[in-house]
Each structure stands twice: as C-alpha cells, then as structure tokens.
Design a protein with these regions (language model features):
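Bacterial N-terminal signal peptides that target proteins for export
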Residues: 1-8
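N-terminal signal peptide c-region/cleavage motif recognized by signal peptidases
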Residues: 16-17
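Short, compositionally biased P/S/T/A/G/V-rich stretches that sit at domain boundaries
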Residues: 23-46
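Short, well-structured beta-strand segments within conserved domains
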Residues: 49-53, 103, 112-120
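Short amphipathic, basic-aromatic surface patches that mediate peripheral association
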Residues: 54-64
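Short coil-to-beta strand junction motifs in C2/discoidin
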Residues: 65-73, 133
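Short acidic/polar inter-strand loop motif in beta-rich domains
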Residues: 82-84, 121-129
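Internal, hydrophobic beta-strand segments that form the core of beta-sheet-rich folds
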Residues: 110-124, 133-137
C-alpha cells in the first residue's frame, strides 16, 4: 500500500511540475511571423552591421511584461544546439536577448559565413506555442 501511495505521490509531483511548466508557455496566433528586415539572406556585410527585426501578427513588450500576443526578440548567432521550447532561452554569445523590446541592434562578427535566426520569447524569455521563429539566414562578413 505504501508503495502505491509513493508512486501516486511521485506521479502527482511530476504532473504538477509539468502543468506548471506548461502554464509559463504563452500562446501565439497561428499567423504570427518574425523575420529579418535587414540584412537579407545571402547579404555581404561589414564586420559591424545593423540587424533590424520584423514582426507580424503580434506586438512587442519588454521582458517581465505579461501581455497577450506579445513578446520580445532573441537573436541566435551560429547556433547549432537544441532549444528547450518550454524553458527560458539561455543567455550566451550565441543567444542574444533583447528584453527591453528592441527591434534592431548592431553586432560585430568575425570575417566569414554566419547563420542568424530570430526567436520571439514571452515575458519570461520562453518561446511561444506555436513557436514564432524566423527562417535561418546566412550573411557573409567581409
């Protein structure tokens, strides 16, 4: 009997944790779209260049502001890892956060080919469901 109670308790804990994690993920309209205004895919750019972010079907709100159908930008640079779409996006040189609601930035990259992608995150930096992600673009830094 104690064993069954133990399993039920464990199941309740796991289920509650899963439900709590799911509640942190914000929904996004099916037609939401994040994209690069500039640079365009295949662009040749200087080592320091401006990136402008575009968004359709949703609005921009800073991190910490929980408003329906809003989020803020995250820029993936040469990112080849896996994202846990139920957790806050990590902070690193490859995952840049724009939690103040910025819609453009200036970055410096070394010469060569680089891949860029945008991901919209909610007030907690967690990607929406469905995820609002741009296509990966490639830029050539001179």
């Amino acid at each position: 009997m104690r064993k069954i109670q133990g399993y039920l308790f464990l199941l309740a804990c796991l289920t509650t944790g899963w439900i709590a994690a799911q509640e942190l993920v914000s929904s996004a309209p099916e037609n939401a779209d994040v994209y690069f205004i500039e640079p365009t895919d295949g662009a040749e750019v200087a080592s320091t260049f401006t990136i402008k972010f575009g968004l359709r079907g949703m609005g921009i709100a800073p991190a910490g502001v929980d408003m329906e159908n809003t989020g803020h930008h995250h820029l993936l640079i040469d990112f080849d890892g896996e994202l846990d779409m139920t957790q806050p996006l990590p902070v690193s040189d490859q995952v840049r956060h724009f939690g103040k609601g910025q819609t453009e930035t200036e970055i410096t990259l070394p010469a060569g080919e680089h891949q860029l992608q945008l991901v919209l995150g909610n007030y907690l930096h967690i990607p929406h469901d469905p995820a609002v992600m741009s296509y990966v673009i490639t830029v050539m830094v001179k």
